[in-house]
Amino acid sequence: MLRILNMNEYISLNHYLILSSLVFTIGMFGLFMHRKNIINILMSIELMLLAVNINFVAFSIYMQELSGQIFSIIILTVAAAETSIGLAILLIYFRNKGSIEITDINQMWG
């Protein structure tokens, strides 16, 4: 007879929180270490948002509440839209100026 495993028996809330804090720390480290390249900054911010989503889903499972998972889906959707718009703006800027360095973007004039 096949036994259906309950994932909460093997993976506790602490495991999810440790994973989330590690992903957030990697994102924060990437944000501070790669301040020159805007693509790396966007990827680091996405990692930090992913860590927040892991927290939402973990607490949603722990509390047996569906709202955390719904918030996570909404956050992922909005983050994907923001990233696509940001990359489109960067692509147009790169075509015009030839560089996407932070120092060059700070010197933009009307």
Curated annotation (Swiss-Prot):
Its main location: membrane. It is found in: Cell inner membrane. Keywords: Cell inner membrane, Cell membrane, Membrane, NAD, Quinone, Translocase, Transmembrane, Transmembrane helix, Transport. The chain crosses the membrane at residues 13-33, 41-61, 73-93. NDH-1 shuttles electrons from NADH, via FMN and iron-sulfur (Fe-S) centers, to quinones in the respiratory chain. The immediate electron acceptor for the enzyme in this species is believed to be ubiquinone. Couples the redox reaction to proton translocation (for every two electrons transferred, four hydrogen ions are translocated across the cytoplasmic membrane), and thus conserves the redox energy in a proton gradient. NDH-1 is composed of 14 different subunits. Subunits NuoA, H, J, K, L, M, N constitute the membrane sector of the complex. NCBIfam families: PRK05715.1-2 (NF004320), PRK05715.1-3 (NF004321), PRK05715.1-5 (NF004323). This is NADH-quinone oxidoreductase subunit K. It comes from Rickettsia conorii (strain ATCC VR-613 / Malish 7).
